[in-house]
């Protein structure tokens, strides 16, 4: 049985979320395609909010 790949946009969102938790700037977005870039930035914003609200302890 083949494993199904995750959706490209979901991966972009997750990578953005993790980048924010690691303290990376939103300027470091690796995606050039508009949809993927928007998802990455959305994930980055969520990650930044989670980081500032809960602190890093919740994610280590």
UniProtKB/Swiss-Prot annotation:
Q: Does the keyword Cytoplasm apply?
A: yes
GO terms under cellular component:
cytoplasm
Q: Which family does it belong to?
A: Belongs to the ribosome modulation factor family.
Matching entries from Gene3D superfamilies are given as:
ribosome modulation factor like domain
Spell out the coiled coil positions from the record: none
Give the highest taxon in the source lineage: Bacteria
Which compartments does it reside in?
Cytoplasm
Give one Pfam hit by family name: RMF
Q: Which gene carries the instructions for this protein?
A: rmf
What UniProt keywords apply to this chain's record, in alphabetical order?
Answer: Cytoplasm, Translation regulation
Protein name as it appears in the record: Ribosome modulation factor
Q: What is its main location?
A: cytoplasm
**UniProt keyword Cytoplasm, yes or no:** yes
One of the GO BP terms on file: regulation of translation
Its job? During stationary phase, converts 70S ribosomes to an inactive dimeric form (100S ribosomes).
InterPro entries for the chain: Ribosome_modulation_factor, RMF_sf
Native organism: Kangiella koreensis (strain DSM 16069 / JCM 12317 / KCTC 12182 / SW-125)
């Amino acid at each position: 049985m083949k494993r199904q790949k995750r959706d490209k946009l979901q991966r972009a969102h997750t990578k953005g979320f993790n980048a924010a938790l690691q303290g990376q700037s939103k300027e470091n977005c690796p995606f050039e395609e508009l949809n993927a870039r928007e998802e990455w930035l959305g994930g980055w914003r969520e990650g930044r909010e989670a980081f500032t609200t809960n602190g890093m302890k919740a994610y280590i």
